[in-house]
């Protein structure tokens, strides 16, 4: 973990209220798939940092890409950043997808929902680099909300679901996965809790890893704002920012 200043290389709105922010900094060297950064807004009245998942990184160039949706004052503040600006960053944080301890799969299904799609990109890239056959299934509310389909096709097959049916399959990600003829060796998923519950229920026998989305205040496990009950004993809790955000599906009670 490192508190540092990162430099803005570029920022672009790539979908409705969704921004691609490219940053440069030394902390990129420590990044792994599934981790996140805590960004500090520039406005003095916004005291809390905001957690943003890491979409991708290039350790040689010392750059990373963050994708975020403008939903409140903090993310609105970030959207005003432009080339050459600096931003106060804490990270990289959290335990991401540890590909070294997972038996090498032949096939992997990566399921993302909304702003849970970004961390699937770097994960898919690294799995593909290992020779894994990657399938992405991304869910959005509407076509105007969708992003990164073209980028993901470089590393695997991409399927899109939209709730309103304006693009891809109408419905949810599970409306796509239920028609797959074979189950994958491993599943990785990030998105809203309802989606993660559906993914977990749809693949009870498949090794599944979930990246949880919870509101965070400190990002380092000190404030207990982002707890999640443990499976089998809901009186015990995980701190999502410190123990996760990635967990085995059988570890957590959603």
From Swiss-Prot:
Cofactor detail note: Binds 1 [2Fe-2S] cluster per subunit.
Database matches in InterPro entries: Cyt_c3_hydrogenase_gsu, Dihydroorotate_DH_ele_sf, Dihydroorotate_DH_Fe-S-bd, Dihydroorotate_DHASE_ETsu, FAD-bd_FR_type, FNR_nucleotide-bd, OxRdtase_FAD/NAD-bd, PyrK_electron_transfer
Signal peptide segment: none
Membrane-traversing stretches: none
Residues engaged in binding [2Fe-2S] cluster: 218, 223, 226, 241
Superkingdom of origin organism: Bacteria
Pathway(s) served: Pyrimidine metabolism; UMP biosynthesis via de novo pathway; orotate from (S)-dihydroorotate (NAD(+) route): step 1/1
Cofactor dependency: [2Fe-2S] cluster; FAD
Domain FAD-binding FR-type, chain residue ranges per copy: 1-99
Pfam families for the chain: DHODB_Fe-S_bind (PF10418), NAD_binding_1 (PF00175)
GO molecular function: 2 iron, 2 sulfur cluster binding; electron transfer activity; flavin adenine dinucleotide binding; metal ion binding; oxidoreductase activity
Biological role stated in the UniProt entry: Responsible for channeling the electrons from the oxidation of dihydroorotate from the FMN redox center in the PyrD type B subunit to the ultimate electron acceptor NAD(+).
Record protein name field: Dihydroorotate dehydrogenase B (NAD(+)), electron transfer subunit
Upper lineage: Bacteria, Bacillati, Bacillota, Bacilli, Bacillales
Gene name in the database record: pyrK
């Amino acid at each position: 973990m490192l508190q540092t200043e990162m430099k803005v290389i570029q920022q672009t709105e790539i979908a409705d209220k969704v921004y691609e922010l490219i940053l440069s900094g030394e902390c990129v060297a420590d990044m792994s798939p599934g981790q996140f950064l805590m960004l500090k807004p520039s406005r003095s009245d916004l005291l809390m940092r905001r957690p943003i998942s890491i979409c991708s990184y290039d350790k040689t160039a010392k750059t990373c890409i963050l994708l975020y949706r403008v939903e409140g004052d903090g993310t609105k503040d970030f959207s005003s950043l432009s080339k050459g600006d600096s931003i106060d960053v804490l990270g990289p944080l959290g335990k991401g997808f540890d590909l070294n301890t997972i038996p090498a799969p032949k096939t992997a299904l990566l399921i993302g929902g909304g702003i849970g799609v970004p961390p699937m990109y770097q994960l898919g890239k690294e799995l593909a680099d290992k020779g894994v056959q990657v399938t992405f299934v991304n869910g959005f509310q509407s076509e105007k909300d969708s992003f990164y389909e073209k980028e993901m096709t470089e590393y695997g097959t991409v399927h899109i679901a939209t709730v309103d049916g304006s693009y891809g399959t109408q419905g949810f990600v599970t409306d796509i996965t239920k028609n797959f003829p074979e189950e994958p060796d491993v599943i990785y998923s990030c998105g809203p809790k309802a989606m993660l519950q559906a993914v977990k229920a749809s693949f009870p026998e498949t090794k599944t890893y979930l990246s949880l989305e919870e509101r965070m205040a400190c990002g380092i496990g000190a404030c207990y704002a982002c707890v999640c009950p443990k499976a089998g004993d809901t009186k015990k809790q995980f701190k999502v920012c410190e123990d996760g955000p990635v967990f085995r599906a059988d570890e957590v009670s959603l």
